Amino acid sequence: MRWAWLLPLLWAGCLATDGYSLSVTGSVTVQEGLCVFVACQVQYPNSKGPVFGYWFREGANIFSGSPVATNDPQRSVLKEAQGRFYLMGKENSHNCSLDIRDAQKIDTGTYFFRLDGSVKYSFQKSMLSVLVIALTEVPNIQVTSTLVSGNSTKLLCSVPWACEQGTPPIFSWMSSALTSLGHRTTLSSELNLTPRPQDNGTNLTCQVNLPGTGVTVERTQQLSVIYAPQKMTIRVSWGDDTGTKVLQSGASLQIQEGESLSLVCMADSNPPAVLSWERPTQKPFQLSTPAELQLPRAELEDQGKYICQAQNSQGAQTASVSLSIRSLLQLLGPSCSFEGQGLHCSCSSRAWPAPSLRWRLGEGVLEGNSSNGSFTVKSSSAGQWANSSLILSMEFSSNHRLSCEAWSDNRVQRATILLVSGPKVSQAGKSETSRGTVLGAIWGAGLMALLAVCLCLIFFTVKVLRKKSALKVAATKGNHLAKNPASTINSASITSSNIALGYPIQGHLNEPGSQTQKEQPPLATVPDTQKDEPELHYASLSFQGPMPPKPQNTEAMKSVYTEIKIHKC
């Protein structure tokens, strides 16, 4: 009996399969936060009563469980699927399409469709597999025009891959540039940007948050701003210094004459500017690159303003540096000589910046153009040269130092002459012992003269000693001749003179650039201050007279007559 009532039920199930079919995609994949539409068609036998559709998770209880989507208003859906899963077909519809919005990772799984109402059927053999993966899409940033400094430009951030049926995304802009928000749509946001030169190369970020899932994505774009050259600088290096120095436009630079110089021009611009150099003279110059100017050996004529020009499509700008060349300080002189009743001295100096000259007499300073009864100073300058002359007509009772001093740009050079007491030269040119004459000598020359005198005295002393030794030998051998009355000294003369020491001093260049030097007269003579001391002499002896008759005795000694001549060395 039990099998009797089961047979009609089995037959009814078989009949139920006739006329039921489900056409749906077996599986779909969707990125997190996005939407997916699953097309579905269901076929079932006609019925006069209402027919509702339901989508359940695999394993759910069709009677007590909640579907994820349904068109039955009396049936509540699963809480986590509420507002996101939609059954697109209405009551008694053959449309079983499923729309999943704001997909979440928990949505991954298998689903089946069921009919309920006047028709009841579950399509568990036609399952739908849903896979939710991580979101890989990012926003798009579109620049409507070229970014030019100072010009307002619109930028658009959009998420065309998002679905309008889902929760509207939230747009955020991040930039250091001057911006303001423009028009907004569901899937796009507009930004008004006014770029500046400093915005070139900076980042602009559009960030999109999908609130339905809490997922946030963003895109960052580097701004390329077109602007004219600005902030020009010049990097310099010179001499043996391997380091560099950066100068702002209008700065000054001073280097030593003969040093090498490198000037590198730098400009901030986009696109990169074309660089060129201008210099104050027509002298050719060397360019390693268009931006670098080189002077292998700086000369005074290289002084002046050097101008670098930078130019691109947006404009031009220049930068300059003023170059001054500092030449070595050279002191020529002093040179002195007696002229008339005074001592005339002159001194010259060459340098750049132009030097200045002054005289120092003892502790006093003589400079400029000045005059009194004792001295006269005349100074002049032209270009790199400074000249000064000094006339001294004063007397000195003790030694004094006379210096010529040149200075330029914190550099000083000095040359000193020693003035000593001595006989003064009168108008007639004769020596007057009652008055002293100013004597000058450069210290170095004086030492050399003293050394020469010492060597000469040593030489003469040795020579005299040799002569005296020879005379003694001759006197011993011819002692008997001295008794001969025919043997007489006809003449004997002794002369003496003062020893004069001259101190020639190197002359100075009378005109700038002259390289010739004129010989100067001796600066002074040293008088003989030890008149009472005996002087060293050497003498040669010769005897002259008639020859005596030849003695009969051949062994007799021969007599020679001569005269004695004494000469001073």
UniProtKB/Swiss-Prot annotation:
Swiss-Prot/TrEMBL keywords: Cell adhesion, Disulfide bond, Glycoprotein, Immunoglobulin domain, Lectin, Membrane, Repeat, Signal, Transmembrane, Transmembrane helix
Ranges of the Cytoplasmic topological domain: 461-569
The primary site where this protein sits is membrane
Indicate which residues form the motif SLAM-like motif: 559-564
List, for all copies, the residue spans of the domain called Ig-like C2-type.
139-224, 229-324
Give the location in the cell.
Answer: Membrane
Q: What GO molecular function annotations does the UniProt record carry, in alphabetical order?
A: monosaccharide binding; sialic acid binding
The record lists N-acetylneuraminate as bound by 114, 120, 122
Give the disulfide map. 35-163, 40-96, 157-206, 265-308
- Stretches for region Disordered: 508-556
Cite the SUPFAM superfamilies for this sequence: Immunoglobulin
Q: Which GO terms describe its biological process?
A: cell adhesion; regulation of endocytosis
* Limits of the Ig-like V-type domain: 18-116
> Which is one Gene Ontology cellular component term of this protein?
membrane
Residues spanning the membrane: 440-460
For the Extracellular compartment, the record's topological domain ranges are: 17-439
A Pfam family of the record is V-set
Residues spanned by motif ITIM motif = 536-541
Q: Which residues are glycosylated?
A: 95, 151, 200, 203, 369, 372, 387
* Signal peptide segment: 1-16
Q: How does it sit in the membrane?
A: Single-pass type I membrane protein
* Tissue note: Predominantly expressed by immature monocytic/myeloid lineage cells in bone marrow. Also found at lower levels in mature neutrophils and monocytes.
Note what the entry says on domains. Contains 1 copy of a cytoplasmic motif that is referred to as the immunoreceptor tyrosine-based inhibitor motif (ITIM). This motif is involved in modulation of cellular responses. The phosphorylated ITIM motif can bind the SH2 domain of several SH2-containing phosphatases.
Regarding protein family, the annotation reads: Belongs to the immunoglobulin superfamily. SIGLEC (sialic acid binding Ig-like lectin) family.
Q: Its function?
A: Putative adhesion molecule that mediates sialic-acid dependent binding to cells. Preferentially binds to alpha-2,3-linked sialic acid. The sialic acid recognition site may be masked by cis interactions with sialic acids on the same cell surface.
In Swiss-Prot or TrEMBL terms, this protein is called: Sialic acid-binding Ig-like lectin 5
Which species is this UniProt entry from? Mus musculus
